[in-house]
Curated annotation (Swiss-Prot):
PANTHER family: PSEUDOURIDYLATE SYNTHASE TRUB1, TRNA-PSEUDOURIDINE SYNTHASE. It comes from Treponema pallidum (strain Nichols). Keywords: Isomerase, tRNA processing. InterPro entries: PsdUridine_synth_cat_dom_sf, PsdUridine_synth_N, tRNA_psdUridine_synth_TruB, TruB_C. HAMAP family: TruB_bact (MF_01080). The gene is truB. Gene3D superfamilies: Pseudouridine synthase. This is tRNA pseudouridine synthase B. The keyword tRNA processing applies.
Length: 366
């Protein structure tokens, strides 16, 4: 009998800053003693936050899970641009800080459906080789614009130059009218976007629209589809965000600008130290496992269908799928995917074809 266990699991996992996504997978793989562990979207090494791990047979869900929308909190540092658009790159350009009014005016142009040119330092492949690897070898790459979607874009806070912003006005509750003509060193944004979106490219483009330049100094992924960072194994190991205290001594006034907090579990981490997951236990990971049930299917936008118990064995052995096997299927549009269940077990993923059904994946065997 097949049961959902660690060899077949979906695990929200909190990656720390300073650790690559691949290294995080390797540590979890060793900890669990399993060979197959994947994830649904790379996080840059400097970033922290939510990775959705797929363990064992559920790695076959990757094509579905990678399409889920994602949410981030990011600190955009103005006045400096690095070649990688993150803190790990070399400085290639400097400029004046933009006014807060120009930043606010630029944001509406980056919501909804937009064309975005990915950063040259990215995991996108050209001829089977990552663009970032080609650039580091001195090769030229031509990044083409891609259509992406931004569902929500909010300013959560900003850091103004005290030389232009009176100390008596600094702090929580400062009026936006007081800030508009003030030059800002950095802003913190909440972004909810489609798959394939690059926050580093957003920082580059917002700064350009403001007549400045920028890079992303801190980045945290707070949500993937219906999964929140607060549910993740190891979330307590992430650093807390203390940007106001840390930068008050650097000549910056730090304050909120009235935006309501987004539905996420924390702010941007300031630590870039890798804590690893050596002290993370199998028990913590198991406690974070997401049940693959009908509710899960609905939450990730899939149809759930139920197979009669007497046909489960035929399904698991890959026999041609027949409509009479199903107790229920819901709508049957061509191309629609569905998770298949029988007596509480998730058996696999199928797709409706014009002349029947086809297998996308079988997750377990008898």
């Amino acid at each position: 009998m097949c049961r959902l266990s660690m060899p077949d699991a979906i695990v929200p996992f909190a990656k720390v800053s300073g650790l690559t996504s691949f290294a995080a997978l390797a540590q979890v793989r060793r900890l669990l003693g399993v060979k197959k562990v994947g994830h649904t979207g790379t996080l840059d090494r400097f970033a922290d936050g939510l990775l959705l791990l797929l363990v064992g047979g559920f790695t076959k869900l990757a094509p579905v899970m990678t399409r889920l929308e994602k949410s981030y909190e990011a600190r955009i540092q103005f006045g400096v641009q690095t070649d990688t658009l993150d803190p790990e790159g070399a400085v290639v350009r400097c400029s004046l800080f933009p006014t807060f009014a120009r930043v606010r005016a630029a944001l509406p142009h980056f919501t909804g459906s937009i064309d975005q040119v990915p950063p040259e330092y990215s995991a996108l492949k050209f001829g089977g080789v990552r663009a970032s690897d080609r650039v580091r070898r001195g090769e030229a790459v031509c990044m083409k614009a891609r259509r992406v979607f931004v569902f929500d874009l909010q300013v959560l806070g900003c850091e103004a130059d005290l030389g232009e912003f009176k100390k008596t006005q600094a702090g929580r509750g400062a009026a936006i009218a007081d800030l508009d003509l003030t030059r800002v060193r950095a802003v913190t944004l909440y972004v909810r976007c489609s798959a394939g979106f690059y926050v580093r490219a957003l920082a580059r483009d917002i700064a350009a629209a403001c007549g400045s330049c920028a890079y992303v100094s801190h980045l945290r992924r707070t949500r993937i589809g219906p999964f929140d960072l607060a549910q993740a194994a190891g979330v307590s190991r992430l650093g807390s965000w203390t940007w106001g205290k840390e930068r008050a001594s650097c000549g910056a006034a730090c304050f909120d600008v009235g935006a309501p907090p987004p539905p996420s579990s924390g702010g941007v981490a300031t630590d870039s130290v890798s804590f690893g997951c050596e002290d993370l236990t199998v028990r913590e990971i198991k406690q974070a496992v997401v049940s693959c049930d009908v509710d899960f299917a609905n939450r990730i936008g899939l149809t759930a269908c139920s197979v009669h118990a007497q046909y489960a064995s035929r399904f698991l052995h890959g026999e041609r799928i027949r409509a009479c096997w199903f107790q229920s299927f819901g709508t049957r549009r061509p191309g629609e995917r569905a998770l298949v269940f029988s007596e509480g077990r998730c058996l696999g993923l199928i797709r409706k074809a014009a002349n029947g059904f086809s297998y996308d994946a079988v997750f377990c065997t008898e």
